[in-house]
Regions:
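Pocket-lining segment of extracytoplasmic ligand-binding domains
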Residues: 36-37, 42-127
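Secondary-structure end/capping motifs
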Residues: 95-170
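Phosphate-coordinating loops and pocket residues in cytosolic domains that bind phosphorylated ligands
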Residues: 5, 68, 182
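Bilobed "Venus flytrap"/periplasmic-binding protein-like clamshell domains
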Residues: 1-65, 120, 160
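A generic structural-conservation signal
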Residues: 12, 33, 57, 75, ...
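Conserved C-terminal helix/tail region of periplasmic/extracytoplasmic solute-binding proteins
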Residues: 163-183
Length: 183
């Protein structure tokens, strides 16, 4: 309820937007009760820090930077939605390039194995790549699930995300989620 009438910036149609709508719903508010401004993560952080918006939808290193700069976390999304990242190809691409898709999945599997077996080096590589310290990468690591297996909970989350997109006018037609998962 404390967000009523506030300006909130973040990326529309993303998991962060979905978290915002879920969080507002817990306080008996709707998106219309706030002024939502579509913007990327770095822009949202800059707008919040400059006072142009009251709150920002942030994730990963950008969220960590905001917290370290004194921002207060209103919600981390827990209990509102599951953060899910999928890799997708078109049915046509899959039919025309099955070996390439298999190779991609194998490389992904090998990368996850490397992370598990070379954790310290993974922290170092990631820190250098994203401009964080190893300690900051370690702090963010538990927020990510690198398991490529598509679980029933993942399918349910995709269904819920689709409902969110339809309800908010970002997807026109409902699709059968199970029919688009390659097994």
């Amino acid at each position: 309820e404390s967000l009523k009438g506030k300006k909130i910036g973040g990326p529309k149609g993303t998991i962060l937007h979905q978290v915002l709508v879920g969080y507002l719903g817990k306080g008996n508010l709707k998106e219309e009760d706030v002024e939502f401004i579509n913007m990327g993560l770095p822009d949202a952080l800059a707008a919040m820090e400059s006072g142009r918006i009251d709150a920002a939808l942030l994730a990963g290193p950008v969220a960590l930077k905001a917290i370290k700069n004194g921002a207060k976390v209103v919600s981390n999304g827990e209990g509102l939605t599951q953060g899910l990242v999928v890799t997708a190809v078109s049915g046509k691409f899959l039919k025309e390039n099955p070996e390439l898709v298999k190779r991609f999945l194998k490389v992904n599997e090998d990368a996850v194995k490397y992370i598990d077996e070379n954790f310290e080096n993974t922290l170092k590589i990631t820190a250098e790549d994203v401009g964080l310290t190893k300690d900051e990468v370690l702090e963010l690591y538990p927020l990510y699930d690198f398991n490529p297996e598509i679980r029933e909970a993942d399918i349910q989350d995709l269904i819920e995300t689709q409902e969110f997109l339809i309800k908010n006018g970002m997807q026109e037609n409902r699709i059968d989620i199970n029919s688009i998962i390659a097994k």
